Amino acid sequence: MVKRGKKTKYLFVTGGVVSSLGKGLSAASIGALLENRGLEVQHLKLDPYINVDPGTMSPFQHGEVFVTDDGAETDLDLGHYERFTSAKMTRRNNYTTGRIYQNVIQRERRGEYLGKTVQVIPHITDEIKAVIREAAGGADILIVEVGGTVGDIESLPFLEAIRQMKYDVGEENAVYAHLTLVPFIAAAGELKTKPTQHSVKELREIGIQPDLLLCRSDRELPRDMKDKIALFCNVDPSAVFTALDVPSIYEVPLSLHREGLDDKLAELFNIWSRAPRLERWETIVDKVKNPRRGEVRIGIVGKYVELHESYKSLNEALVHGGIANDARVKLAFIDSTKLEEGDLSDLDKVDAILVPGGFGIRGTEGKILGVKYAREHKVPFFGICLGLQMAVIEMARNVLGLAGANSLEFDEATPHPVVTLMEGQKGVTDKGGTMRLGAYPCTLKEGTKARALYGAELVHERHRHRFEFNNDYRAQFEAAGMVFSGVNPDLGLVEMIELPGQHFVGCQFHPEFRSKPFAPHPLFAGFVKAALEHRDAQQRQPPAEVKKLAVGKNG
């Protein structure tokens, strides 16, 4: 480990040509490589949109909202950072234009700029530089990812701030990495460098000369192509790297290491570090690519299935569950709104059913049908957040006989509000940042599946919700066989449920936010194990006829 007391060094990651090139994964992979060389790494994501945070944004526009232990609703890239490194993300690891401006305006209202005209330069850029320094937290290297694409007007204050940082901290303490696209044009049969040249030209016009280029491509760039890019972009030929498309995201660190990226960074930073130890990554990639126990199909019943990024951490946590069981997890995204039309045949094609979190009434009856199918057909089931609430409503209607049972979120006139608004949420009118957010304790009941999977009595998990199970109905559910296996020790809130005799588990929290490839979350490892056992049992039996469950008011 580098000795403390040395200045933090800053790596700024920008992107050009098109969005969704993989800046977040690249930043996370670089973090993994540097951490494996014995360096302490931290991350910061700067997002150019004016929202204070992504908490109120549609998953179709933004993808998943990643929740940190301290209750921040953040960009999904922070999930990559946590999964790839040991760094803990907090609210200081993600800033938006809206949050930066909010800070500056609050200072202006308090009179801290008294007598001055508050401007983008220097006040906004100074605030950006201040949050960059704060995010470093004494780490050896802070990796700063600037969201958006170079050339976007929204990104200009952030780019100006990171331009100034090199002069503030010194050339050896700041490196600019630019991720760009080198497309292969099939009709011409060749790679094209012009988009990269124009992107770097745009960056240089802003005042930033990239120190290294990550060239995203579906094939290796030949040496002469790298030399051409280096010549036209004014970088050293040894600083042009192929960012190769790979089958698994966990192969990205290994791919970049083979390119020599971490060695080049050590040279540019003039920093000594040990050789990277990547055996763990090699093992993980081998398990992902060559599973010994074959493939298992998990059905995700949700309404955001058209954009898989909406469930990014969930998808990766299921992959981790597969790693723990030496199996490949095949995800089948099932649109809950289509289940409401009556055809449940897609559910018969999977080895387990998962109902994830979500908001709003659309698609909820389809999710309830998915729960009913799992319960009646003994298919392994896992309900997360809203998924737990759907399981409660399904059992209330179809086992307890509580006609019209529902959540107050969807029906304020329901005769049986088995899911109700949390006491602390009553009277709350603002939407942003007002839910039950962050890590809370959960006590697990002795003798339950949850306790066995965790191997502990007390756990802490991250939450993002306003509604909870209504404890007024608890005795009725227990009499019908439901086990309340996890409870918040402070407020008595139900955190976990399960049904005996099958793998039927629900949790009010989001365990996917704590899962890593090297430490799969026990609930996902247990769920995938149950799916494998169900798959094997089904293969020993003749296929059952698909049953269509009637769709009615009670699900």
Curated annotation (Swiss-Prot):
Mg(2+) binds at D77, E145. Allosterically activated by GTP, when glutamine is the substrate; GTP has no effect on the reaction when ammonia is the substrate. The allosteric effector GTP functions by stabilizing the protein conformation that binds the tetrahedral intermediate(s) formed during glutamine hydrolysis. Inhibited by the product CTP, via allosteric rather than competitive inhibition. Coiled coil: none annotated. The keyword Magnesium applies. GO terms for cellular component: cytosol. Residues 1-271 are annotated as: Amidoligase domain. Keywords: ATP-binding, Glutamine amidotransferase, Ligase, Magnesium, Metal-binding, Nucleotide-binding, Pyrimidine biosynthesis. Residues 535-555 are annotated as: Disordered. One of its GO terms (molecular function) is identical protein binding. ATP binds at S20, L21, G22, K23, G24, L25, D77. It catalyses: UTP + L-glutamine + ATP + H2O = CTP + L-glutamate + ADP + phosphate + 2 H(+); L-glutamine + H2O = L-glutamate + NH4(+); UTP + NH4(+) + ATP = CTP + ADP + phosphate + 2 H(+). CDD domains: CTPS_N (cd03113), GATase1_CTP_Synthase (cd01746). The active site is at C385, H510, E512. Signal peptide: none annotated. CTP binds at S19, D152, I153, E154, K192, T193, K194, P195, T196, Q197, K228. UTP binds at S19, K192, T193, K194, P195, T196, Q197, K228. L-glutamine binds at G358, L386, G387, L388, Q389, E409, R466. InterPro entries: Class_I_gatase-like, CTP_synthase, CTP_synthase_N, GATASE, GATase1_CTP_Synthase, P-loop_NTPase. Disulfide bonds: none annotated. Belongs to the CTP synthase family. Catalyzes the ATP-dependent amination of UTP to CTP with either L-glutamine or ammonia as the source of nitrogen. Regulates intracellular CTP levels through interactions with the four ribonucleotide triphosphates. CTPSs have evolved a hybrid strategy for distinguishing between UTP and CTP. The overlapping regions of the product feedback inhibitory and substrate sites recognize a common feature in both compounds, the triphosphate moiety. To differentiate isosteric substrate and product pyrimidine rings, an additional pocket far from the expected kinase/ligase catalytic site, specifically recognizes the cytosine and ribose portions of the product inhibitor. Homotetramer. This is CTP synthase. It comes from Anaeromyxobacter sp. (strain K).
